[in-house]
Amino acid sequence: MPNIIFQRTSIRKYTGENVSPEQIETLLKAGMAAPSARNIQPWEFVVVQDRETLDTISEFGSFAHMLKEAPLAIVVCADTDKEMPVQAGKHYWIQDCSAATQNIMLQATELELGSVWIGTFPKEEMYKPLAELLGLPKNIIPVTTISIGHPSEEVTPKNKFDKGKLHFDKW
């Protein structure tokens, strides 16, 4: 079986079929298995299945249009109160939540679901109205939004390996 990392690709069109509760739990477990700075695990996950809410989120940014077809979005949020004093102002939670996002997307591929990463933070026009819509406390920031569903399109993953981007020992 080919490595799931190389099978993953962005899927923006979905059948509309719901993602099962078991699949959602598996996706969330994968997200929580991600590494995090000092093992703080600053993430919180908002599972969005409500059609009206998905449609509203799709209007927050030009790159969120696929949510109009998606049966599910997982909003990966950071609890900024979990930032340790030694980390203050460094926002390691961005990296931590990004790792969780990648894990969820890889797990989606393994489950034969399609997904696409929708950049949320630091775009104020995206993350501020999303935080308000979802009723997030002030210390919780939506970092990424993942659109997830059963793919209605077949997309061949691209080979992105580029030897020109490799540097050993020195630039």
Residues covered by each model-derived region:
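Acidic, surface-exposed loops and disordered segments
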Residues: 1-171
